[in-house]
Amino acid sequence: MSIYKNNHFFVTFVVMELRIGNGYDVHALAEGLPMWLGGVRIPSATGFVAHSDGDVAIHALCDALLGALALGDIGHLFPDTSDEWKGIDSKILLAKVVALIGEHGYRVGNVDITIALQRPKLAPHLLTMRETLAPILGVPVDAVSVKATTTERLGFVGRCEGCEVWASATVIKP
């Protein structure tokens, strides 16, 4: 923020505590299961093997947000050994993580997600993912980045055996 007074230029700084977290998740693919990514149902013959709905993008994002405040990971908060979380919509898990961040006096700043998946192509769904995640995170759509890539048919992703996702997030204490 800048202020002019009596032709003098003053610079003032707003001090906020900013923290950064990173997350990663991977899920195997199997025939006949639903594919959820970034809170959006993706038309596909395969989907994710998981205890919850398998939304690997939201899981990586949750871990990034939790990591920013050293609050563990989603496996600790929502263990796959508990029937309470069986088949749960991952958007609910994300909302719980965002609430937990708020309880610690922080809010989400921005997030960046990279999805590695050979097929289906995700480009037609990326904006919808951003628009789905933004209100849950309490940020504008332009604070949510979702990108997709392939592994050029290399590794388990390239063989269409699974999907991996990396996420980064900033949280801010005003």
Would you name each region that the model predicts?
Residues L133:
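Glycine-rich, mobile lid/loop segments that gate access to catalytic sites or pores
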Residues I3-Y4, F9-T12:
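Short, positively charged and aromatic/hydrophobic N-terminal segments
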Residues L126-R130, R159:
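Short, low-complexity, polybasic intrinsically disordered segments
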Residues V157-P174:
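C-terminal edge-of-domain segments
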Residues V146-T150:
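Pyridoxal 5′-phosphate
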Residues P140-A143:
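Short acidic capping loops at alpha-helix termini that bridge into adjacent secondary structure
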Residues R153-G155:
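Mobile acidic interaction elements
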Residues E17-L127, L137:
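RNase III-family endoribonuclease catalytic core
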